[in-house]
Structure formats: C-alpha cells, structure tokens
C-alpha cells in the first residue's frame, strides 16, 4: 500500500493499524529461522502482517514431529491452560448477533462521501462513526481469528474468521474515500475546522499525518490508476511467495541417525543446528544447490519488486524508495544511515565472536553452516511454565509494582493459551483489539527459549494494555518501529536477572550465548539485510540491471565484510538473497536492529537509574501512536537520530562477549 491508499489503512483503519496487535515471536528473533519472514508491519503494521506471514513459518523439530500425533484434542486441554475468549464474547451466538449488528452499519460508512469539506461537523461525524464501526469490527475479528488459531481444523471457526475478514473488506472499501477527500480540503480550511469544533482536536495528529503527504499525492485519476495497477505491480512478490512456499522442494539427506530425511523450510534450521558437521554441511549444500536452479527466476521477481518500489517513489515525487518507505512513520533517513555506519564500525566485534565460536567448537575453520549449531548446550536448563512465570515476575520486577500487577492479571485471568494441541497454529504471538484484553498464544516446551518467548510476548501485551488504557481509539496502536522495543526490553531485563542469579556457571554460559546470538541475529544480520536492500534499490534506480550475478556478488561481498577474514565464506551463501522474503517488503528489516538497540539502551537506563527511567518507559508504553515514533522514543530517553543507542548496544555486546570468554576459561579450568 503506497501513498494515499496506504494512509487510509495506517491512520484510520483499525483492523490493520491498531485494532489487532499480533506479533509472531519466531519472526522477531533476527530471522535466524530459514523461513525468515517478517514480516513483521502497517502499512505492514507489525501486528497483522506478522501474523499472516507467520502462518508459513516456524517448522517443528524432528522430535516434535514424532510427537505430533500424540497431542491432545482441543477439547481435552484444561480450561485453566487456555485463553479466556469469553471475555470478548460470552458465546458464539453473541458473536453472530454482533456480526449482524455491525454488518448493518457498514453501508452508512460512506454516507458522508463528498460532504467532508462542507463543515467541521460532517468531518467529525464521519471520523467518529468510522471509529465506532471499526472498533466493533476489530473485536469480531480478534475473537474469530484466535478461535480459528486454537484449532485450525475447526471448520466452524474458520468460517467465522472468513466472515469477519470479508466484513472488514466491505468496511475498508466503504471508507476508502476518507483520506483522498481530506486531502482535497485546503490546509487553512482544515485548521479552521479544528479550531471551530473542539472535538476535532482529537484527530489533529492523525490529520497532520495525512496532510504531510500532500506533496506526494497525485490527481484523483492518477491515484485511481495506481490503485488499479497495484495488483499487477505486486505480481513479482506474489510469484516469489508461490514459488518459494509451494513449488520449491528440497532433496533428502541422512540425519544424525543415518535415516533419510527430506529437507523442508521448517526443518532446515534443525539440520543446521545439528552437532554432526556433515549433516550441517549436507543440508546447507542441498538447500543452496536447489535455490541455484531457480536463481534466474528469483532475480527476476526481486528485480521486479525493486523496480516497483522505485516506480512508486518516482511518481510520488520522493527522492528514493527509501525516503518513501521511511516517510510512512516520519523516520529521518539519517536513522538508517547511522545504523549501517555504526554497525560497520563495530564489525570487529562480530569477527571476535566468530573466532570464539571457532575456538569453542574446536574447528580448523568456521564455515557459514557452523553458525547455527549451539555454542553452549542448555546445561540441563529445563523450565516449566510455572517456573517461567516466577522467572518473569522476578526478572521484570525493575519495571515497578504497576507493571507487575498487569503481568499477574494476565497470568491469573487467562490471557495466555499455553500448551500445544492438535490443529493449533505454530509459534507464538500477542493479539487483541481495542476494548479487549491482550492475549498470548504459546506452544509451551520446557526450555529457556520458551521462557524468553513468554517474556517477549508479554512485552507486546503490556504495551498494548497501556496504550489502549491511556489512548483514545484513533491512537490505540503503535508502529513496528517501536513495537519490538517493548518486547526486547523485557528480554534484556530477564537476561540480566538470570545472569545475576543463576549459580550454575554452565547455565550462565548458556544465557550469555543466548544473548549474544540474539544480538548477532537481530542487529548484525538485519543490518546486513538493510545494507543489501539499499544497495540494490540504489543500483536499480541508477539503471543497473539486477542480474543473478550482480545480486549474488553483492550479497557475497557483504557476507565477507560482515564475517571477516576469520571465517570461510562459502560461495553458496551468495545465493541467500534468493530465499529471503524480507526483501519483498521494502525498507522494513532495519527496524529490528534499531528496535533492539533502543531496547538495550532503555533496559540499561532502567537498571541504572531506577524510578526516573521506569517512569519515562511507562509513559512510552502509554503513548500509542499519539506522537511520531522518533518523538515517543526521545521522551523515553533514546534518540534514534543519533548513533548513541547503536553504540551503546555494541558496547553491551562487547561486555557480554568479555564475560563469556572469561567464564569459558573458568569452566574449562575447573
């Protein structure tokens, strides 16, 4: 969605931008999963977009696959371990009754079409009526999609989900006139409307977000033509998605036990994590040999998407596709440049980490396929769900009593759907709507990763709780630029708590490695993605064809730069660009690195300053989209227009690397 059309969705459409907040955790962990998609947001708001894409991600492990048929039916799961969706609608009958009531309201959504410029009253009434309908529609959809996700084999709830989605489409169509018509009103007249009708001040920031796009809005006929062409212009991305997810198949290789096993998108990561190096290498070679057979097609689809991005930017009178993409959240381009420049400056830290990996794994040389096998085993760290709740409450205690009370409310009032059952969707997410509790989907396993996942998702949920409680409906959402800050701050606080309180040194090593890998995947890797993305958009804008050879060489050279001379950069990795769905969502991934860095800065302030930093942070959680993301973060204590947060995050990585090296030496000598 671009330009005017995008603003309809981002500013006013609750369904995408702020009614539903879903963040699939597996997609936010630095894309270390082979199906790394993000995702990720709003235009592509972090919520709904992540959820849709996550339907394709995160396979189950080989052991889990064997157990899949032993999972209980949904009806056999204890009620106390499920989310209490009855708090949204007490019954399916109540949902259907509300559905019919909202359906009858849809035709009136367009009753003010052609009348917004007539008076302040008409403008206000159109906006408030739209909000009331979309708020109710958001609750309908949230209930339906979560009922569907708890058992994807339940055709009744799949039907509810489809009905809610179709109703939303009707509502979106009926309100599509709003933004173009607001833009047709002269600025002086809009300001006069706001002055003469006090209630319109509620929408002043939202209207400002729309009107700042005036220089980039075309004539009505031109905008209509672009809208008509959007499906055609998006065909490259659709072709990639079908090819990558439906048509490409990988060969079989022998697993650790000598059994033939076919590689899939879902289990590729399990092969790469294998302790058997031959298994890792064979999986790596097989996957990239397969992608090599499709490199010409993949180059065509990626080139088509980049051309589309550059085309939209050009006709909308932006200097570049990057400026166009970042303008959606009013992010200065210097934020992007600061990230790339600062991370490049600190690449020796990544080189040092690779050297440590080589030493610990006792390898003569480190290859790309050696990056994923665990550096440190879990040291027997089995964590039950009950233990995880205790860890979470203690680890997040620095955020204060009010924050703790919200966590307890969520745990006690069944915000979390805890365990696996047959048909339940994979992964984890936080969801909800304005006027409902936040909800969390988990598929609990007794390990540290699930502990961090739970804390991560509660970060999103408490963020949503504060935002919806303290902001009116038009601002009861938040952009992806700040979304991952809240979840990652929680992870950082938990990590520090565990490091300070675990007595077993091997367990502390495991936590340190978890934190270092998180940084490598979320900051170093995503910044490399961001650098690649900008390079190919720039080359295409300058008229250079994006051939498979060019794409492969650019990507290979970036890997050489990022990983350094201490690592063998296998030629196959040059083809990784061909399987990354990120690159079809222009200028999106940099936000993972900036969000992670902001979270590290905020968590450090919270632990060092105490209450003043906590108060700023809670105000940040309450702000929603009432201000621009950059401004919200500045008030919290982090200025992302400067390199300082990235510098501070790199300093944290260095300190954790020091600590791990020292602890490894100590454990080895004991």
From Swiss-Prot:
InterPro entries: OligopepF_N_dom, OligoPept_F_C, Pept_M3A_M3B, Pept_M3A_M3B_dom, Peptidase_M3B. Induction: Expressed at a low level during exponential phase and induced twofold immediately after the transition to stationary phase. This induction is dependent on the sporulation transcription factor Spo0A through an indirect mechanism. Disruption phenotype: Inactivation of the gene does not cause any detectable phenotype in sporulation growth conditions. Deletion does not affect cell growth in rich or minimal medium. Its main location: cytoplasm. It is found in: Cytoplasm. Belongs to the peptidase M3B family. This is Oligopeptidase PepF. It comes from Bacillus subtilis (strain 168).
């Amino acid at each position: 969605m671009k330009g005017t059309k995008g603003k309809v969705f981002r500013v006013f459409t609750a369904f995408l931008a702020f009614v539903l907040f879903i963040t699939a955790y597996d997609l936010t962990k630095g894309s270390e999963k082979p199906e790394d998609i993000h995702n990720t947001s709003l235009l592509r708001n972090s919520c709904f977009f992540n959820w849709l894409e996550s339907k394709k991600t995160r396979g189950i492990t080989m052991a889990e696959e064997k157990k899949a048929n032993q999972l209980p039916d949904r009806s056999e799961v204890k009620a106390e371990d499920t989310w209490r969706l009855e708090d949204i609608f007490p019954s399916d009958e109540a949902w259907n009754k509300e559905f019919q009531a909202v359906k009858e309201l849809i035709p009136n959504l367009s009753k003010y079409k052609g009348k917004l410029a007539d008076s302040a009253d008409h403008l206000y009434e159109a906006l408030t009526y739209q909000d009331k309908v979309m708020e109710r529609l958001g609750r309908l959809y949230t209930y339906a999609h979560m009922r569907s996700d708890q058992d994807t084999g339940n055709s009744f709830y799949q039907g509810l989900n489809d009905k809610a989605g179709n109703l939303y489409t009707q509502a979106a169509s009926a309100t599509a006139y709003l933004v173009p018509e607001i833009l047709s009103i002269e600025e002086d007249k809009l300001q006069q409307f706001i002055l003469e009708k006090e209630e319109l001040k509620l929408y002043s920031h939202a209207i400002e977000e729309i009107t700042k796009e005036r220089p980039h809005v075309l004539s009505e006929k031109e905008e209509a033509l672009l809208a008509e062409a959007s499906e055609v212009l998006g065909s490259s991305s659709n072709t990639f998605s079908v090819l990558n997810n439906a048509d490409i198949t990988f060969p079989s290789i022998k697993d650790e036990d000598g059994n033939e096993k076919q590689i899939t998108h879902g289990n590729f990561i399990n092969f790469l994590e294998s302790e058997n190096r031959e298994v890792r290498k064979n999986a790596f070679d097989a996957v990239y040999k397969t992608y090599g057979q499709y490199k010409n097609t993949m180059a065509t689809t990626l080139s088509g998407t980049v051309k589309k991005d550059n085309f939209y930017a050009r006709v909308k009178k932006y200097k570049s596709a990057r400026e166009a993409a970042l303008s959606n959240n009013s992010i200065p381009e210097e934020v992007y440049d600061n990230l790339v420049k600062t991370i490049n400056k600190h690449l020796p830290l990544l080189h040092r980490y690779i050297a440590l990996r080589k030493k610990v794994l006792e390898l003569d040389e480190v290859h790309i396929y050696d990056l994923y096998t665990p550096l440190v085993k879990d040291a027997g760290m089995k964590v039950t769900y009950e233990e995880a709740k205790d860890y979470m409450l203690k680890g997040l205690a620095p955020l204060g009593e009010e924050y703790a009370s919200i966590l307890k409310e969520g745990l006690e009032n069944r915000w979390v759907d805890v365990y696996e059952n047959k048909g339940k969707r994979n992964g984890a997410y936080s969801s909800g709507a304005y006027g409902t509790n936040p909800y969390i989907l988990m598929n609990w396993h007794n390990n540290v990763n699930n502990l961090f996942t739970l804390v991560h998702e509660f970060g999103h949920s408490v963020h949503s709780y504060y935002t919806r409680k303290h902001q009116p409906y038009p601002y009861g959402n938040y952009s992806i630029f700040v979304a991952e800050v809240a979840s990652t701050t929680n992870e950082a606080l938990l990590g520090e708590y565990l490091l300070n309180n675990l007595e077993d040194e091997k367990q502390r090593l495991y936590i340190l490695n978890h934190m270092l890998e998180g940084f490598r995947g979320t900051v170093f890797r995503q910044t490399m993605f961001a650098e690649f993305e900008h390079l190919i958009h720039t080359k295409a804008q300058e008229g250079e064809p994006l051939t498979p050879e060019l794409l492969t060489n650019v990507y290979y050279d970036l890997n050489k730069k990022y990983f350094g001379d201490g690592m063998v950069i296998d030629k196959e990795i040059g083809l990784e660009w061909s399987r990354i769905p990120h690159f079809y969502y222009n200028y999106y991934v940099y936000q993972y690195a900036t969000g992670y860095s902001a979270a590290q800065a905020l968590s450090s302030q919270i632990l060092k300053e105490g209450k003043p930093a906590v108060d700023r942070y809670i105000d940040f959680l309450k702000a929603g989209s009432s201000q621009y993301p950059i401004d919200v973060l500045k008030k919290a204590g982090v200025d992302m227009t400067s390199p300082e947060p990235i510098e501070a995050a790199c300093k944290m990585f260095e300190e954790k690397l020091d600590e791990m090296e020292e602890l490894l030496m100590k454990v080895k000598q004991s």
